[in-house]
């Protein structure tokens, strides 16, 4: 097992140093123990050893969807640093991609585009590691991982064994899966099914279609689709840039709320009473007859504009995108959570709609 890896400043994230160097929010206190796993066997062994010792365990990927308490984590952290990509033709113009969990996600997407494989390009620019994508059922610009995922190799912490689980058995839903709500399995590698030929997945997202000057549902050059997605994400502060505090975030902090069919009319009426009957409420079909609303739209209409609460705030909404809560350089996790509560409670008070956090909260809560 490899030893503790240095942080950006060369310090270990144990003792008095912080896990902040391993999260895109740059927040979080120290860990009691920290190891780096550079291959799947080491990763599995590190998890087994922590479990055998009865230690609390945090498996750390890219830290892009993580909010860690200021007090830190009083257990062992295993940082995933496994590498490896494999492409196998399976016939009919289809290619299976196998990626180790520690591969940087955007680098994986870039390589698929370089090879002319369509499917993942709309997920360009999303920070984090590949192993996290099925856990969150990562999605953007009209595409979700669930549409392309074949299977994952998991370490089952209950038995200590490694097993392959098909995508359909992972309970993949909007921004979630059975893996997100249980700590009993660790993703070791992931398999996707992609299409050869240099064309993108059908362009479904209206904003992306306009950017590409493409008809909704059409396919475009896969490289052009990737560049358009990256440009859109940069405009919203959603591509990591150490010099831009708008990217010191966990991405979208709240998921888009999903409203049951029986409740939709009452919810829309309440929103209309607040914003005016002539304002169109963005809504999108979800599973089982439900409707997805836009969290960003609700946040803005509840009075929380870009950059809230304004200059001087240590934690602020991004100046580019209201759905991102950001660290302006000197924030604490407590600052961030205070802002999150203010926004969540404000939307609930105005519209009766509950916003749920998307990141994983480690030893802290809203």
From Swiss-Prot:
Transmembrane domains' residue ranges: none
Record-given protein name: UDP-N-acetylenolpyruvoylglucosamine reductase
Metabolic or biological pathway, per its Swiss-Prot or TrEMBL entry: Cell wall biogenesis; peptidoglycan biosynthesis
Cited function: Cell wall formation.
Keywords, ordered alphabetically: Cell cycle, Cell division, Cell shape, Cell wall biogenesis/degradation, Cytoplasm, FAD, Flavoprotein, NADP, Oxidoreductase, Peptidoglycan synthesis
Subcellular location: Cytoplasm
Family stated for the protein in its record: Belongs to the MurB family.
Active site positions: 175, 252 (proton donor), 358
Gene3D superfamilies: 3.30.465.10, UDP-N-acetylenolpyruvoylglucosamine reductase, C-terminal domain, Uridine Diphospho-n-acetylenolpyruvylglucosamine Reductase, domain 2
Lineage: Bacteria, Bacillati, Actinomycetota, Actinomycetes, Pseudonocardiales
UniProt organism field: Saccharopolyspora erythraea (strain ATCC 11635 / DSM 40517 / JCM 4748 / NBRC 13426 / NCIMB 8594 / NRRL 2338)
Residue runs in coiled coils: none
Stored PANTHER family: UDP-N-ACETYLENOLPYRUVOYLGLUCOSAMINE REDUCTASE
NCBIfam families recorded: murB, PRK13903.1
PROSITE patterns membership: FAD_PCMH (PS51387)
Keyword NADP: yes
Keyword Cytoplasm: yes
FAD-binding PCMH-type domain boundaries: 27-197
GO biological process: cell division; cell wall organization; peptidoglycan biosynthetic process; regulation of cell shape
Catalytic activity, as annotated: UDP-N-acetyl-alpha-D-muramate + NADP(+) = UDP-N-acetyl-3-O-(1-carboxyvinyl)-alpha-D-glucosamine + NADPH + H(+)
């Amino acid at each position: 097992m490899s030893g503790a890896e240095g942080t950006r400043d060369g310090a270990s994230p144990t003792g008095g140093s912080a896990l902040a160097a391993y999260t895109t929010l740059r927040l979080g206190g120290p860990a009691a123990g920290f190891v780096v796993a550079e291959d799947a066997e080491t990763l599995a062994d590190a998890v087994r050893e922590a479990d055998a010792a009865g230690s609390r365990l945090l498996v750390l990927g890219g830290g892009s969807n993580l909010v860690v308490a200021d007090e830190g984590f009083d257990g062992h952290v295993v940082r995933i640093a496994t590498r490896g990509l494999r492409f196998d033709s399976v016939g009919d113009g289809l290619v299976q991609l196998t990626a180790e969990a520690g591969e940087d996600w955007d680098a994986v997407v870039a390589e698929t585009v370089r090879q002319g494989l369509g499917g993942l390009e709309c997920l360009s620019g999303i920070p984090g590691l590949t192993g996290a994508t099925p856990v969150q059922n990562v999605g953007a610009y009209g595409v979700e991982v669930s549409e392309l995922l074949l299977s994952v190799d998991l370490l089952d912490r209950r038995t200590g064994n490694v097993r392959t689980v098909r995508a359909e058995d992972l309970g993949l839903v909007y921004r979630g899966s059975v893996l997100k709500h249980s700590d009993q399995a660790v993703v070791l590698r992931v398999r996707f099914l992609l299409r050869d030929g240099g064309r993108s997945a059908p362009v479904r997202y209206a904003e992306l279609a306009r950017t590409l000057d493409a008809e909704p549902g059409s396919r475009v050059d896969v490289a052009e689709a990737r560049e358009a997605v990256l440009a859109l994400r940069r405009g919203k502060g959603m591509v990591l840039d150490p010099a831009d505090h708008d990217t010191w975030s966990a991405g979208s902090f709240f998921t888009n709320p999903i409203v049951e069919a029986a409740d939709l009319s009452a919810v829309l009426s309440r929103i209309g009473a607040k914003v005016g009957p002539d304002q169109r409420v963005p809504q999108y079909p979800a599973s089982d007859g439900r409707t997805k609303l836009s969290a960003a739209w609700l946040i803005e209409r509840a009075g929380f504009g870009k950059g809230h609460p304004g200059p001087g705030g240590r934690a602020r909404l991004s100046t580019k995108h209201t759905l991102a809560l950001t660290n302006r350089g000197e924030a604490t996790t407590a600052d961030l959570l205070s802002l999150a509560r203010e926004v969540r409670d404000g939307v609930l008070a105005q519209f009766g709609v509950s916003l749920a956090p998307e990141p994983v909260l480690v030893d802290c809560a809203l």
